[in-house]
Amino acid sequence: MEMGNGMKDARNLDKQWVVLSELSAELVNRGIKVPEIVFEKLRLANALLSYYILDPHASINILANVERELNYVQSQLFSLCDTELTEKYLDRMIKAIRGEINAKFPVSKSNYNREVKKRGKVEAIRVKLQKEMQIERLSDLGEWHGVIFEYSDEKDKVIIEGNIDRVKRALKDFAFMWKED
């Protein structure tokens, strides 16, 4: 599905979402503890934005909710940044607000579970988790990427199932959660 024609304008909130997601990942990569609520709010904002973008009847009022969630996320994340990171991401946020960055928002299509199974070219990869994670948390992450996470019968391992490119992307994005064997 191409952005642009026929897609609803989300007032660049989609671009802001992408920038904040990148910032959260950057903080995690630097070993900084990002509060769980930040990821919950990012997922919520993603779900709301996706619904708004995909559903022609969705009310524009949804965007106010998205904005509220993103403002919260932004204040939480920026409070964890050093000066250099703050400047870098403040600059990106301003560009996002003006629509000057070309960021691809990952539209989340729910009820993907059954689809993934049907769609052929399905890969299943078994990975070892660094620490105990609730399967709910994993299924949220899975939904984000259009893959399915299932606990493996082997201890501390999960199976990621889905289109091979998506599985690779999920592996990369959540690299901080997996144990090197």
Curated annotation (Swiss-Prot):
Lineage: Archaea, Methanobacteriati, Methanobacteriota, Methanomada group, Methanococci
Pfam families: DUF2096_N, KH_DUF2096_C
Organism in which the protein naturally occurs: Methanocaldococcus jannaschii (strain ATCC 43067 / DSM 2661 / JAL-1 / JCM 10045 / NBRC 100440)
Source organism, top-level taxon: Archaea
Name of the protein in question: Uncharacterized protein MJ0856
